[in-house]
C-alpha cells in the first residue's frame, strides 16, 4: 500500500499562505531544498488541489528551457511525474500526465495501488478532506520563523488526529522541519 504524505511550508501561527495566498514569507535555502528533495524522491505521484495544480502548471513548465539548475531538475520531475489533481470543476488539463479526480475518497483506491508514495504539495483544503477520511500517513512540515497573523490556515477545521514526531531538523535560517507519522 502506498503512503499518502503531506509536504507543506507553514508559519509559526499555522498558516500555509498569506491573506492573498502569497508565499513570499517562505524561507528557503539549499539545505531545505535538499531535505525536501529527499521526501520528493519517495513519490510515485504528486497530489494537487485545483488551485495548486494551476499554480504549479503556471510556474514549473516555464523553467524547462533554462540552464540546468536544481529548479530545472525539479521542473523536469514535475513534468514527468503522474499528477493526481482533485477538482470538481476541472474537466481536463493540458498539462502532461494529469489524472483528474472528482472526489477526495478516490485517494483511498489510489493508496491501494502499487508504487511509491503519493505526495500532496500544499493544497490545505485537500489535506483537510483527506484527514476526514483518515487517509494521511505522514506530514513533512517546514515551519517558518514568522507570524503571519492571517492567511490560509493549514489545519483550519481539521479533525482531531494523533501524530507521532518521527524526526525534526533545524536549519540555519530558523526553519524547523517536522516529520510526523500517524500516532496510536
How should these model regions be labeled?
Residues 1-184:
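Enzymes that bind and transform nitrogen-containing heteroaromatic metabolites
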